[in-house]
């Protein structure tokens, strides 16, 4: 059966029944039909003095283009914990329409471990991302209107970009204000994908609506002729922008196919943004259940590093345990096996690729001081010989492992992982950040590059050098850094999978995000507006005469 058929056959519970499992009274719910609801932020005020549950982070090795199943493992783990009578909840990101219609597909899991209603979550859901797009573009409209109406603030340079939640490379650089009207000042502009926008980052890091408004007001949108900053609050924009987000800021409650509760809220990418769901949803999840399972996008070099160095500075606790997801196909890919041959058995390529997994484990254990288990996401094409080889190699290294068959068996296929996670959460961790906030900007970049990526150093463009000097001079040196880098490699070269030769990280630009509270470091050939592949997933998605969606809304299943 296709994933979409499995999802349609599931017996979902009314969302009020799902909420009841968590002890949420109906008056705290704002229902969007039978199976979705927003949770009033007043609930957190009621629960804030309650002890936090265990926090489990799910991350992975560097992925192949179709992903390795972090969401699948996360959902399977939550269902597995429920099967052994543990109170569990998921705290995941919302899917972006970019990947849904691009190459990767949706982000609601697969097989018998999905969050539902799958089609609605993968498309417009409760409208959060559209609200974020509107807030972002309202600010753009206010900037250009201010300039048109006389430019009282003296804009000389505008750095704020518009956004849209689609992969559209044609919008990376555009010319605007070409109407020829009096006072219209033509200028170069560009679009980011919404999930890489500063509004999305702010949305996911804000503690509450007041913090959201404060952060929005802090956004630097441009500079005057004297090089002085112009902020969103100078345009009196923060109030109207926050109004657009007043409902979006409330976490969304849904369920898995096995009726385990799930909070899905916020969705920044991890390669070009910080890659974690909202702080609000994560904090609420830890109050509502004994085990809160969350994930960070792409590999542990990106999402997990940003979760630990950026998001955890805004959370009351750090992870009690980490699951590092690995697949045999990805390990063979990192061993140099051509992607078209990836389903063929090969111990040779598997052996070469294991170093990628071992580097991620070393980072999580020795750089961050966390308790780690490897979740091997079993694919139909994995052979017994490959599985045994991988398990033996990891056991030789003293690595905790669990073979997970949740895609095919649901929560039942993740019981071993669930039991091991319960034990792992009881072991003390010795968490430490990769860098300290009082390190210089360059020290932060270089610590991540050398400790996490394994680079021998960092090279900076002249433009990046100047921006870093200016940021330090203007008092921004104590901010965390968010490195935008390819997800496919430890290096900034997507084709350098093996990373066996010494390499350097190349910083080409630096962007200050005062509202989000971090500095974005652009490396290699990374773009904040992705493009579509030659054959987009959109070509396979359709709707039949009865109104049923057909085609692939999910990533390719483990086959």
Tell what function each PLM region has.
Residues 3-60, 85-86:
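Extreme N-terminal, non-catalytic leader segments
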Residues 58, 62-75:
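Glycine-rich phosphate-binding P-loop
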Residues 310-328:
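Inter-motif core of Ras-like GTPase G domains
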Residues 367-371, 376, 381-382, 387, ...:
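Hard-cation-handling environments
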Residues 555-559:
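Conserved small/polar residues in nucleotide/adenosyl-binding loops
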């Amino acid at each position: 059966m296709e994933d979409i058929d499995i999802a349609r056959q599931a017996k979902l519970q009314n969302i009020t029944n799902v909420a009841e499992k968590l002890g949420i009274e109906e008056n705290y719910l704002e229902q969007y039909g039978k199976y979705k609801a927003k949770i009033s932020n007043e609930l957190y005020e009621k629960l804030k003095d309650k002890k936090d549950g265990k926090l489990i982070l799910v991350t992975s090795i560097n992925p192949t283009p179709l992903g390795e199943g972090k969401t699948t493992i996360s959902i399977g783990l939550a269902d597995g914990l429920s099967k052994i009578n543990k109170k569990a909840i998921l705290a995941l990101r919302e899917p972006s329409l970019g990947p849904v219609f691009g190459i990767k597909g949706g982000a609601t899991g697969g097989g018998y471990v999905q969050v539902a209603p799958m089609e609605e979550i993968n498309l417009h859901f409760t409208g959060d991302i559209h609200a974020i797009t509107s807030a972002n573009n309202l600010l753009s409209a206010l900037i250009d209107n201010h300039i048109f109406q006389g430019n009282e603030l003296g804009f000389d340079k505008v750095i704020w970009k518009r956004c849209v939640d689609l992969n559209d490379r044609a919008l990376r650089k555009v010319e605007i204000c070409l109407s020829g009207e009096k006072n219209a000042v033509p200028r170069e502009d560009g679009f980011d994908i919404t999930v890489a926008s500063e509004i999305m980052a702010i949305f996911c890091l804000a503690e509450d609506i007041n913090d959201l408004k404060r952060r929005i007001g802090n956004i630097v949108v441009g500079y005057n002729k004297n090089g002085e900053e112009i902020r969103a609050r100078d345009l009196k924009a923060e109030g109207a922008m926050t109004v657009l987000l007043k409902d979006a800021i409330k976490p969304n409650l849904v369920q898995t196919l096995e009726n385990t509760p799930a909070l899905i809220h916020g969705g920044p990418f991890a390669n070009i943004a910080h890659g974690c769901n909202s702080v609000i949803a994560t904090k609420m999840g830890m109050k509502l259940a004994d085990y809160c399972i969350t994930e960070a996008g792409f590999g542990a070099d990106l999402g997990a590093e940003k979760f630990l160095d950026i998001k955890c500075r805004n959370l009351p606790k750090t992870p009690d345990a980490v699951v590092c997801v690995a697949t045999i196909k990805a390990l063979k890919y990192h061993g140099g096996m051509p992607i078209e041959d990836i389903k063929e058995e090969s111990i040779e390529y598997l052996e070469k690729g294991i170093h990628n997994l071992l580097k991620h484990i070393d980072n999580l254990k020795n750089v961050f001081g966390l308790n780690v288990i490897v979740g091997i996401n079993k694919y139909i094409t994995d052979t017994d010989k490959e599985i045994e080889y991988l398990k033996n190699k990891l056991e030789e290294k003293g690595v905790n492992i669990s073979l997970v068959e949740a895609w095919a068996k649901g929560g039942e296929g993740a019981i071993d992982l669930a039991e091991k996670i319960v034990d792992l959460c009881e072991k003390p961790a010795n968490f430490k950040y990769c860098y300290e906030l009082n390190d210089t900007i360059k020290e932060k970049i270089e610590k991540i590059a050398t400790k996490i990526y394994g680079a021998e150093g960092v090279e900076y463009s002249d433009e990046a050098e100047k921006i870093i000097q200016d940021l330090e001079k203007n008092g921004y040196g104590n901010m965390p850094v968010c490195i935008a880098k390819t997800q496919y490699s430890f290096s900034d070269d997507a084709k350098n999978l093996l990373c066996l030769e010494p390499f350097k990280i190349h910083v080409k630009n630096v962007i200050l995000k005062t509202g989000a509270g971090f500095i974005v470091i652009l490396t290699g050939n990374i773009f904040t507006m992705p493009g579509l592949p030659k054959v987009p997933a959109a070509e396979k998605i359709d709707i039949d005469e009865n109104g049923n969606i057909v085609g692939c809304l999910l990533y390719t299943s483990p086959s």
